[in-house]
Design a protein with these regions (language model features):
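Transmembrane signal-anchor hairpin modules in multi-pass inner-membrane enzymes, especially those
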Residues: 1-43, 77-87, 142-151, 193-200, ...
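Membrane-interface micro-motifs in multi-pass membrane enzymes
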Residues: 1-3, 56-60, 119-133, 168-171, ...
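Hydrophobic cores of alpha-helical transmembrane segments in multi-pass inner/ER membrane proteins
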Residues: 5-11, 64-73, 127-141, 436-442
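Transmembrane alpha-helices of multi-pass inner-membrane enzymes
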Residues: 6-12, 180-183, 194-199, 390-393, ...
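Alpha-helical transmembrane segments of multi-pass inner-membrane proteins
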Residues: 9, 42, 83-113, 122-252, ...
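Aromatic-anchored transmembrane helix interface
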Residues: 30-37, 51-75, 88, 93, ...
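Long extracytoplasmic/lumenal interhelical loops at the membrane interface
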Residues: 308-337, 341-382
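Hydrophobic transmembrane alpha-helices and their immediate junctions
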Residues: 381-414
Length: 456
């Protein structure tokens, strides 16, 4: 938590209006769901053996409760404040996007860009990507209030969509898709041509989705091996200081990287093909890229990687999707052993590591992580009751957003619900603070009125 928040809390403790705070708490009874969720994690310390790990987990998760309690209990959010804060956030996002792109461009020019996550210069690649996608519905809210023009909204949506696609972050792409669907739903609902537009919109989304699924489900053409390993090594030695039987800069086998790169170029796997490679091609292979698409980045690069992971890769190490499958399988095995109370918030890492060893996981030690699924992590830590509380809270916020036509809250709830399937959203300070902050400014009774009041 920031110094300003700690100071705010300290001043409230000294001179706060406790009666008003209690009344606000009672008028926002959903806060008790957050309190129960955190208290259940605190209680799980009694059956945890690693108390240091447990206390650290509680410290991170306290932002989820502390921010809503402090904001809703002591502040009254006005519509003009919402407009001002949203403008500042949008401006900050545009500036950071610009700096990220410039920085990444410099890395590319100097052949230092090895991973798309280097695009995010200032923090978590995934978290910033989700924030960028979510900001689309914030901009749409300003447009509905006639604060920004259609031109500005369109330009902003195009910018964040282009950045999201280029970032190759699946959670961000998923979030942006939901934001676009919710914006489309609201536009359709408010027009007299809703049926025709709705049918057309559904057809476009359906056809686009079908094409994407078809592309991913279709395996790449089989890629063999070099016709002569000796000749390939000799030809490669004339082009690069990296031995062909060594590793590329990503830690992958250089021979296989070169073979896949040549296959992507649709040329024969021969020494002659190696000799015809450009200097840029050789550098791409040294950097671990398996095609010109993957070296250039973008959504096509991510689709190629997904196809390879699903249809060809055998070793999960270094492949994000296959590693997640391994995480989920291991986490589920831990849950099967402790379904009701979990292992305690402090013992999740230990039990995951024990299960990796017990099942003979092929993941390398540095790739053996937690589940990357907040529902599984919660179930492992505090049992089935924790998962039910988590789902109850998210679904309640989504229902309120839908019932009150609070599109920002609806989008936030849908994004949180689905991204928690892919990320341990509450396991980092940034993630817990992100969710806690937006719960605080979106879900309170006074805040909901300010967000949904029309000024046109």
């Amino acid at each position: 938590m920031s110094v300003s928040l700690i100071l705010h809390a300290f001043l409230f403790i000294i001179a706060g209006n406790y009666k008003e705070f209690w009344q606000r708490l009672l008028s926002n009874k959903w806060l008790f769901i957050l309190l129960a969720f955190w208290c259940l994690h605190a209680l799980s310390l009694t059956w945890s053996t690693d108390l240091n790990e447990g206390w650290d987990g509680l410290r991170v998760r306290i932002s989820l409760v502390f921010l809503p309690l402090l904001y809703i209990g002591t502040l009254s959010l006005k519509q003009q404040q919402i407009i001002t804060y949203t403008k500042i956030l949008m401006l900050a996002i545009v500036v950071v996007i610009g700096l990220n792109v410039i920085h990444y461009g410099v890395l590319i020019q100097n052949n230092l860009a090895l991973d798309i996550r280097q695009l995010s210069w200032f923090g978590s690649h995934i978290r910033f990507g989700i924030l960028v996608a979510f900001s689309g519905v914030l901009a749409f809210n300003l447009w509905k209030k006639q604060v920004i023009s259609t031109l500005i909204l369109t330009a902003y949506l195009i910018l964040i969509l282009m950045y999201t696609v280029y970032s190759q972050t699946f959670s961000a792409i998923l979030s942006a898709s939901f934001v676009m669907l919710i914006i489309g739903y609201d536009l359709i609902r408010s027009t007299r041509f809703s049926r025709r537009i709705g049918i057309g919109f559904i057809l476009v989304v359906g056809i686009t989705g079908a094409i994407a699924i078809k592309l991913i489900a279709t395996p790449n053409p089989a890629c063999g091996t070099f016709e002569s390993d000796d000749e390939a090594r000799k030809a490669w030695a004339l082009r690069s200081d990296f031995p062909l039987d060594s590793l590329d800069r990503k830690g992958q086998g250089l021979t296989r990287t070169a073979e896949r790169y040549l296959c992507a170029n649709e040329v024969a796997l021969t020494a002659t093909s190696i000799q015809k490679l450009s200097k840029k091609d050789v550098l791409n292979i040294e950097n671990g890229f398996t095609s010109r698409h993957s070296a250039n980045g973008g959504i096509w690069s991510r689709l190629e990687e997904l196809k390879f992971e699903l249809h060809e890769a055998k070793d999960p190490n270094g492949h994000s999707l296959l590693q997640r499958f391994a995480y989920w399988k291991t986490a589920w095995a831990v849950i099967n052993d402790h379904p009701w109370l979990g292992v305690g918030i402090g013992d999740i890492n230990r039990e995951m590591e024990n299960k990796y060893n017990e099942t003979g996981s092929t993941l390398k030690p540095e790739n053996r992580n937690r589940s990357h699924n907040m529902y599984l992590t919660t179930w492992m830590g505090v049992g089935v009751m924790g998962v039910l509380l988590l789902l109850w809270g998210i679904c309640y916020f989504g229902w309120i957003g839908f019932k009150e036509q609070h599109l920002v809250l609806l989008a936030f709830s849908v994004i949180v619900f689905f991204t928690m399937c892919l990320e341990d959203s509450l396991e980092t300070q940034a993630g817990a603070s992100f969710i806690g902050f937006f719960i605080a400014i979106l879900c309170g009774q006074h805040a909901r009125t300010a967000w949904t009041t029309k000024n046109y």
